[in-house]
UniProtKB/Swiss-Prot annotation:
<keyword id="KW-0238">DNA-binding</keyword>
<dbReference type="GO" id="GO:0006352">
    <property type="term" value="P:DNA-templated transcription initiation"/>
</dbReference>
<dbReference type="InterPro" id="IPR039425">
    <property type="entry name" value="RNA_pol_sigma-70-like"/>
</dbReference>
<dbReference type="GO" id="GO:0003677">
    <property type="term" value="F:DNA binding"/>
</dbReference>
<dbReference type="InterPro" id="IPR000838">
    <property type="entry name" value="RNA_pol_sigma70_ECF_CS"/>
</dbReference>
<dbReference type="InterPro" id="IPR013325">
    <property type="entry name" value="RNA_pol_sigma_r2"/>
</dbReference>
<keyword id="KW-0731">Sigma factor</keyword>
<keyword id="KW-0804">Transcription</keyword>
<dbReference type="Pfam" id="PF08281">
    <property type="entry name" value="Sigma70_r4_2"/>
</dbReference>
<feature type="short sequence motif" description="Polymerase core binding">
    <location>
        <begin position="36"/>
        <end position="49"/>
    </location>
</feature>
<comment type="function">
    <text>Sigma factors are initiation factors that promote the attachment of RNA polymerase to specific initiation sites and are then released. This sigma factor is required for the synthesis of the antibiotic actinomycin.</text>
</comment>
<feature type="DNA-binding region" description="H-T-H motif">
    <location>
        <begin position="130"/>
        <end position="149"/>
    </location>
</feature>
<keyword id="KW-0963">Cytoplasm</keyword>
<dbReference type="InterPro" id="IPR013324">
    <property type="entry name" value="RNA_pol_sigma_r3/r4-like"/>
</dbReference>
<dbReference type="InterPro" id="IPR014325">
    <property type="entry name" value="RNA_pol_sigma-E_actinobac"/>
</dbReference>
<comment type="similarity">
    <text>Belongs to the sigma-70 factor family. ECF subfamily.</text>
</comment>
<dbReference type="GO" id="GO:0016987">
    <property type="term" value="F:sigma factor activity"/>
</dbReference>
Length: 180
């Protein structure tokens, strides 16, 4: 690779580092896996940097590599048990309530199919447009919209179920205390 292209790649990584660091925790629950995912995506992208015609789409290319790598990992680990208690660390500036909400949402996202989860992460956490998300995932804008609609409906359903379960437990506890 020519020195100019190496510098160009380094500059993109340096200037887009905050955005790049936000994507992996939405794709994999373990913070260590998230770091590995980003590292792998950067290494793979670096190896193919000369072949990328439009360098302005580097973010989308890197996200696509992360999604593909995550999919490869899931296929390889398909038969292994996935721990549900591991959640990514929240940023220090989050309040306790925001941290709890984020942890609840991350846990609830585990019910989504990988494609649905990818669409939710790119559209809502990365705040990509429908068209950008479609390009990053290699699908049509209509598919992004319908997948997002189904994913959000499934998340609402999951969160409502959890809320009803929590209320039932609170009611049982009050009844137990009143009877004692």
């Amino acid at each position: 690779m020519a020195q100019g292209e190496v510098l160009e790649f380094e500059e993109i990584v340096r200037t887009r580092q905050d955005a790049l660091l936000r994507t992996p925790p939405g794709l994999v629950p373990d913070p260590v896996d998230a770091q590995d995912l980003l590292q792998t995506a950067l290494a793979r992208t670096y190896g193919r940097w000369e072949g990328i015609a439009d360098k302005r789409l580097a973010d989308a290319y890197l996200r696509r590599v992360m999604i593909n790598t995550r999919t490869e990992w899931w296929r390889a680990r398909k038969l292994e048990e996935v721990p549900t208690e591991q959640l990514p660390d929240a940023r220090v500036e989050d309040s306790t309530e925001q941290h709890a909400d984020r942890a609840l949402l991350m846990d609830a996202m585990k019910v989504l199919a990988p494609k649905q989860r990818s669409v939710v992460v790119l559209r809502h956490w990365e705040q990509m447009s429908t068209e950008e998300t479609a390009a990053a995932l290699g699908m049509s804008a209509g598919t992004v919209k319908s997948t997002l609609h189904r994913a959000l409906a499934r998340l609402r359903e999951e969160l409502e179920t959890r809320d009803l379960d929590a209320r039932a437990l609170e009611r049982e506890e009050r009844e137990r205390c009143a009877a004692a």
